[in-house]
Design a protein with these regions (language model features):
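Non-catalytic signal-transmission and effector/linker regions of two-component phosphorelay proteins
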Residues: 2-38
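Generic N-terminal initiation segments characterized by hydrophobic and/or small/turn-forming residues
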Residues: 5, 13, 30-32, 47, ...
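A broad, low-specificity signal for short, low-complexity segments enriched in glycine/proline
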Residues: 8-14, 36-41, 54, 69-73, ...
């Protein structure tokens, strides 16, 4: 049973392709762009603008990017303005990155432009108390 779950996860990940384009990470399913992650400088930190669907199978990519910056003390502002879907796994990835920051006592993650439905879900499960959210 466990091997079937691992095989299914592998097949799902195999359908997505990651491409780098300058300061952008682009994730495709076939020829369809699923998620774009565009990173730019922002007041001594990084702005990570997301566009598209933050699916479960992409959560670890976002977490890896956040951790790479925050473990060296960089502030990362994550902009959800153009996000159309956020999975529970993606929310968990944000929480795990925040816990790493808390343990290292360096770096910072700030979330902004969170869609109303996502904010309500985050509030229901207590994430709005644990994560820094900019109005």
């Amino acid at each position: 049973m466990l091997w079937q779950a691992a095989r299914l996860r592998s097949e799902v990940n195999a359908m997505l392709t990651r491409k780098m384009d300058g300061d952008s990470m682009l994730f495709y399913e076939g020829n369809t762009l699923v998620l774009a992650v565009v990173e730019t400088d922002l007041d001594g930190g990084i702005l990570m603008a997301l566009q598209g669907e933050l699916r479960s199978e992409l959560a670890h990519h976002i977490q890896d990017e956040l951790d790479a910056f925050t473990t060296v003390g960089v502030k990362v502002t994550v902009d959800f303005k153009n996000v159309t879907f956020v999975s529970a796994s993606a929310l968990n990835a944000l929480l795990i990155s925040q816990q790493l920051i808390d343990s290292l006592r360096q770096g910072q993650i700030v979330l902004r432009n969170i869609p109303d439905a996502t904010y309500r879900k985050m509030d229901e499960i207590g994430l709005t108390e644990l994560l820094m959210i900019e109005d």
